[in-house]
């Protein structure tokens, strides 16, 4: 401690659970813990939802896109019921009330070009997908595809799309007194004699030692640095990079859909997001974004223009604005850097009271919270403290979506 530090301004504060990371996973967990009676708080060093959460397309899907190889995978089976689960929350009948969250679309489409139509038809005739998809034709087609030039097949999925900033706002609003902005330049972990960790927070002349029965890391890519600071021996994190493409235009039709290609990953995934100036952004993911991770921005934009001109040649994007966004999907390490099938949470090695957690996809944030509550229960960690600790820290802002930042649409 510096010689001029006034020890009279030092104090210990207690809470049951401290969550580090204010994305969807951390905010969802905060709700679940408070509902279970825990005195929980959340610390975020940036804006709530920043990085991976707001970079998401907002899809709540039931895994159909993971079955495009023709097989039911662990990923597909793990999340088959998630659209229904989230839908109950949006209706106010689930474990968290999300009635104020903006729903961008209550369905998602899967469409094919003429060259892949037979594959799509054969697959969706199987029992594996029965009740989860419906074929649409004629006037049932989305307006974007109601043109003579379109000759592919279209299926309507039970998946839905949420406005992620709206979701973050809805989750954060009821619990603002428990959400704090932390500056890791003036805060650090302390290893206690019993092997547990506390967090020392310096604010002005005040020093607080925040003691918690458990610390839960839900900081996405930031978990790696936090685990390093803690001296944790496990788990190890992997990242799988993407480079998404954003197209700002004034074409009238909103669209949410996957285009089936020759690979297991959709050729391109399109979600639509309104801008304040009346235009909209098509946010492009799928194989285009996965392959785009190794490309420069200009090269990827050229590929995206070619893809859209092949798939939707009747859409005039000649006056559109284009941009790209690099995204790192943070996950627990898998063999051959494969995509994880399920949410992950476990106690960190060499840390008595630290859990490392990754939802691995937006859809599974509720599953992650359930896993963490079970870990706490199994270890016998029960609610002990009544009210949130007094921390002289401000409440973080809500992160802006990437199209607002990239196109100046704030």
Feature names for model-found ranges:
Residues 1-17, 35:
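Extreme N-terminal leader/targeting segments of oxidoreductases
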Residues 58-143:
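Dinucleotide-binding Rossmann-like beta1-alpha1 core, especially the glycine-rich loop
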Residues 101, 138-181, 209, 287-288, ...:
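Helix-loop-beta segment of a Rossmann-like dinucleotide-binding subdomain
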Residues 154-214, 218, 222, 366-373:
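Helical element adjacent to the flavin cofactor pocket in flavoenzyme catalytic cores
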Residues 158, 166, 312-408:
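C-terminal catalytic lobe of FAD-dependent flavoproteins
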